[in-house]
């Protein structure tokens, strides 16, 4: 077959070895990250006075980023934007985010490690691809770089090693990049690498294993309650993500002294934690998620956690936002469950995924991640809640715009068409205006083609004089 002859066998062998190597390296990367961050968290909880060092540790983190020649403001959302544009990722990002996350956690910053694993995975995946001199498997496409492919593989593998959810990890990285680099072959490659990473990491007992919950039977009343939790989770998740993104965008444009921001906010976080006894809200928050599953939380605990996460990540402390997002969603779901008489553990599970979908604008990844974490029994509830979570929230979150599903696109087209007709003064006027614009476009296209033809003629005969338009029209 012709497509077989187009395959570069050497590159194919390199790709197979690369897939396995990324899986292995990503697994041990996640293991190292977990050991370091978990140690920092244990020290913070054992020696509560470390919270007073949070401002100093934040400044030290920014100094380390400067030494690594990275932007003070660089975070996961910046990396996602680079992935969407197929730009390379700095190899120094892996050690920088590892050190930054550990220092933030040591001082009591409300940050996680999953997004840090994303950044480390992207950096490692791309660095390995350069060492392999990796190119496209197909000979006629070897002029295209593979930065995005290699980085996505590292991202999905490291995330899978933390959550032991290969499908959710792969769909998350593709969804974050709007499926721009998606192909069946790449999907399989990323999935194999993610499975390898999860299989290696699992026996070590690392990662954040969200406890499974009992899933009730499907009833009309329960479905309505799930719709309510999903809708509110999506709306509040989107609001949280967009607010955090807006603050970070403002900092990039307006903030000239990032050290001052970390110092002032770090002092503020320290005062809040000490004054109100919020030590349990420090770090990623897995302890809070376990409490939510048992129903032993306060009604407004989700708001407290969201506030501390917003202050830490919004001011420039380094760390992940994914685990805190899941925790906030779980706390919100548990609170809503208590209000509407739904099992707290089940409500926590629905809240986790719907808030995550609203914040990231990744409903497909939330669906697969949800049933991998909570089991296939949750699928009908998950599907319904995520549809309402995505539909109720605006098409923008922490990572910018999400994928455009049909109902979003159709609704936007309908709104634009209605506005166009109203501005034109009716359907007939709108059609006439469209015809006029089409004629203008055709004329402009014809003039551009004529100009290009003249340019080509002059290029082929430099001595030729440009034609006289007036003479040609006479």
Feature annotation, model-predicted:
Residues 1-474:
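Alpha-helical transmembrane segments and immediately membrane-proximal extracytoplasmic
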